[in-house]
Amino acid sequence: MLHSRDTIAIPPGATIREQLESRKISQKEFAQRMDMSEKHISHLINGKVELTHETALRLESVLGIPARFWNNMESLYREQEARAREELALEHDETMASKMPYSECAKLGWVQPTRKIAEKVHNLRRFFEVANLKVLEDMQVPGIAYRAVGESISSAYAQAMWAQKAKLDAREVQTDAININQLKASISQVRALTTSEPEDFCVELKSLFAKCGIALVFLPHLNGSFLHGATFIDGNHIVLGLTVRGKYADTFWFSLFHELGHIIHGHISSFADINENNELEANYFAQNTLIPTEKYREFLERNDFSKGEIQYFANIIGIAPGIILGRLQKENYIPYSWHNELKVMYRLSD
């Protein structure tokens, strides 16, 4: 027997059991009369096997109840069973939907606005392209790599919605075949764009990455996701998504090169979860690519963190001074109150 909040599915076997009890017939004797194994009869009574038309004819002979009665009962049971399973899935999905940032995503136009939980479930199933939301619990994007801060269990659904939107938007981007060597050869060009304005480097980045088989997409930040970016393979291209909430240049470029580090080091080609070592490796790639380790060490040894010296060093290595300032502040070489006029706030359009 299967039951949900509104439906109870009772197998024909329950009626067979009642008939046997009223006639004082054991399952063993009944199996012999039906010319079936005791195991099959047990499964039949408990609704674990289908009551076929052939079985219905045997029941008509043994119990004297018309075959059409049993066929109708079986048909009704299977219908009720399917309905109950759907209702149970809906109940489970309603719980999941209530934990997702649905209203925020509706305001962004990702899903249709509604207050009805059943409609939210329907819309979310279409958004995630799944028969039911429970599938999401066992289905992860293979080799997904993302940079998040303050991550918690409650952020998982927001991250899932953000990554799915990145995947959907990336399908609209025309890319060449994935070419990691091409990407490696383009790193210096990408780095040089740190001194450009967003309206210039956004277009250039998308073009450079498309030639490497990477679809670059910019998305709004979702509250609770704590995401700066995410990278994963979808079909025949790599999806690289970055948040576009107001952020400083140093955070933007570090996040971008962090994701590029995951791609170049092959972290997203595996079905295994991204581990701490992968994150450290991607961090090191971002740090060393933006500010070469040896040059940074020499700069630190001079122990002059004045505004002019930071600008001079930035000019020498060819990056925006705000990137150097951000790293000095993060590593506690200078207070966060120093030289913030060197920081540039990006407001990218998604």
Q: What are these language model-derived features?
A:
Residues 2-350:
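Active-site hotspot residues in diverse enzymes, especially metal/ion-binding acidic/histidine motifs
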